């Protein structure tokens, strides 16, 4: 039984869809993003997607937000620290990291799963994970209780 499953079951029992909100962490600044995430949860967001900024996102709608977050110096370690603080404030709200593969690869796959778990992240969306790399990334995440979607 995961936070994601409990969240979806609660929404199903309430006969409503889940309000899943995406935030590019670091836009306009890491501190402002963290405050925004807290306000979104307090206002009723059921689940938060923590968007990791990337210099060349495939989803062009988030390109400008990613550029601003990168200009603000946002890094994956900082995002994980923010996730950890959000987790302490909101222990039942699912947090899903939304990232591109290059960011994860540069961070280091060997430490990724354990660091996601330590930060209280509930899932990983790796939107551009190549099929040939899934055999390495998926077991790392699953071994740490982090479901991954590609």
Predicted feature residues:
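N-terminal small/glycine-rich loop or linker at the start of catalytic domains
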Residues: 5-27, 61-66, 86-98
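Conserved, mostly hydrophobic/aromatic
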Residues: 21, 40, 48-51, 116
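Active-site mouth loops of central-metabolism enzymes
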Residues: 19-35, 70, 94-108, 149
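Active-site-adjacent beta->alpha loops and helix N-cap segments on the catalytic face
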Residues: 1-11, 30, 55-62, 72-84, ...
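Generic structural signal for hydrophobic
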Residues: 40, 86, 115-116, 141
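Short, well-ordered coil/turn segments that N-cap beta-strands
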Residues: 14-19, 44-46, 90-95, 121-123, ...
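Glycine-rich loop at the start of a catalytic domain that most often binds anionic cofactors/ligands
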Residues: 32-40, 60-66
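Hydrophobic alpha-helical segments and helix pairs
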Residues: 90-125
